[in-house]
Amino acid sequence: MNKKDARLRRARQTRAKIAEMKVNRLTVFRTNSHIYAQVFSECGTKVLASASTAEVEVRKELDGKGATAAAATVVGKRIAEKAKAAGVETVAFDRAGFRFHGRVKALADAAREAGLKF
């Protein structure tokens, strides 16, 4: 089992547990150049809010690359604002098998500070 397969296995387990809880899900996806966040509905089929470092508005706030903890903080605040505008206050955090460290942790902390509960 390689590194990617192990991450996907962990992600599958997490998503199965979140699906049992029947709550909205905040999902994070991390690449070498960007970080993406989406809030899915309780059934998991509808995207209620999304934010990423690939968005023009976010790139204007950043001075440089989108693959930093500072960029993840901006995305975390933005996803929390969009989720609250869509009427979502409480979510389950789905780290998609990534370690809760660095950019993933920065995004989660910023979303919590901006008012999302998880």
UniProtKB/Swiss-Prot annotation:
GO terms for biological process: translation. It comes from the Bacteria. GO terms for cellular component: cytosolic large ribosomal subunit. The keyword RNA-binding applies. One of its GO terms (molecular function) is 5S rRNA binding. The keyword Lipid biosynthesis does not apply. Keywords: Ribonucleoprotein, Ribosomal protein, RNA-binding, rRNA-binding. Part of the 50S ribosomal subunit; part of the 5S rRNA/L5/L18/L25 subcomplex. Contacts the 5S and 23S rRNAs. Belongs to the universal ribosomal protein uL18 family. HAMAP family: Ribosomal_uL18_B. This is one of the proteins that bind and probably mediate the attachment of the 5S RNA into the large ribosomal subunit, where it forms part of the central protuberance. NCBIfam families: L18_bact. This is Large ribosomal subunit protein uL18. It comes from Cupriavidus pinatubonensis (strain JMP 134 / LMG 1197) (Cupriavidus necator (strain JMP 134)).
